[in-house]
Amino acid sequence: EKLRSGQKPHWRFKLDEKIIEWNDLIKGVVKFDLKNLSDPILIREDGSFLYHLPSVIDDIEEEISHIIRGEDHISNTAFHIEIFRALKASIPNFAHHPFLTDQQGKGFGKRIGSLSIENLKNEGYENITILNYLINIGSSKDITPDTILDDVLENFDIKNISNSSAKFSDKVLKSLNSDVLKN
């Protein structure tokens, strides 16, 4: 009836009703029952693509080995894995990090621009300070004022990231920046 009325269809990816399991580099073993998801729309009625198919194709083309994203994308990962399989492509490693919160435990929304990296840089924070802080916040490691990029990256281990939300501390960031500037 919709087609007869001239309405164009959108295209969905048919999910099998099964449990998808993967070893998340932060969360550990994750199981997701696909019957709890509706078949994701890949192409809108106007022919434009939604995020999912282009994202997976880009990951395949660029030979992405690790995908690190927020824990709000766990359900996306379940059907992205199915799209990788349908395309007979290697499935990358996935890691889903917890959200960054303020000191009261409230999450930072995308619409709150005050905590953007650009704003932190404009406030005088060094690039190495921001990187060092962000890759270590919420980990079991002490945040030290490494000033050499190779040292920061060499000391990073994704296994140190906690499953719990990390609390952003302007005080710790300021102190770290001060230490970096002294070195």
Where are these regions (language model features)?
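Active-site cores that bind ATP or allylic diphosphates and position pyrophosphate for catalysis
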Residues: 1-108, 116
